[in-house]
Amino acid sequence: MVQTLKLYSQSEAYMNKTLVFQSDFGLVDGAVSAMEGVALQVDSELKLHHLTHDITPYNIFEGSYRLFQTVNYWPEGTVFVSVVDPGVGTNRKSVVAKTKTGQYIVTPDNGTLTHLNKYLGIVELREIEESINRRKNTELSYTFHGRDVYAYTGARLAAGVITYEEVGKELPLSDIVELDVVETEYDAAEKSVKGCVDILDVRFGSLWTSISRDDFYQLNPEFGKRYEVSIFHENMLAYQNQVVYQHSFAEVPVGSPLLYINSVYRVGIAINQGSFARAYNVGTGTNWKIRIRAID
């Protein structure tokens, strides 16, 4: 049997026809389905997937973090369309970023690229040329760029209809809009590390902090040992207790709190089979500070 080898164009050679959507749209109306339909009109053989559509409305930081949590695990050539866009219809830029590991992010440049740029690495940025990369006859539509610009451009890129260079002009990486990220503070005299509550492990109510594993390791932590955990909201103490550090949840009794290293190698705080966030009314963001102190 003679096999025929398919010759790929430059654009097809590194695109894998995989498109992953993220948004704050939810699934209660037709917005997500409309984006899927636009993508399949471009190429019915595209493989469509969904990161989440339950980003808290308008929460750009959360959208940025979920990309950081996910992108690195997808194959090179995967295209992500992320639409958390409270500035839709304004003069904020629409871009496609290429990551160090070869994935592409189609998004408004409004801070959504913050965590990828800081922790994974973005190597190239291009502004979407909407005179070419926009659905026809949508020029007077100002409130659904997720469908008309981002899903359309993402699908064309994933399908190999356009090359990355054909997205639009290259922009300096210094143009990337970034949100504030709290840096970990290590206090040798106090034997403590300080950061903030970045985000929740939403379904289970665990806190995911900004304190990296390496930063936490400056305390020379030991499994089974207790550490003083203090959480502050607007500089007011919201929680303080001695919490045990363990590998995972089942190593403490049901209903007990623990410190652990989560799946993105940050310090997490959880309750075994319970919600820490709900139990102690803890939120997320730079105004929710946390201090972990070694106890002599």
What are these regions (language model features)?
Residues 18, 30, 42-48, 62, ...:
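Active-site histidine-anchored catalytic micro-motif
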Residues 24, 153, 272:
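A residue-level signal for conserved active-site and pocket-lining positions in enzyme catalytic cores
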Residues 1-13:
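N-terminal amphipathic/basic-hydrophobic helices that include classical n-h-c signal peptides
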Residues 50-70:
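N-terminal beta-loop-helix "entrance" segment that forms/cooperates
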Residues 138-223:
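Anionic-ligand-binding alpha/beta catalytic cores of soluble enzymes and soluble regulatory domains
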Residues 207-281:
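A conserved acidic, glycine/proline-rich C-terminal tail/linker
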Residues 16-54:
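N-terminal glycine-rich anion-binding loop in soluble enzyme alpha/beta folds
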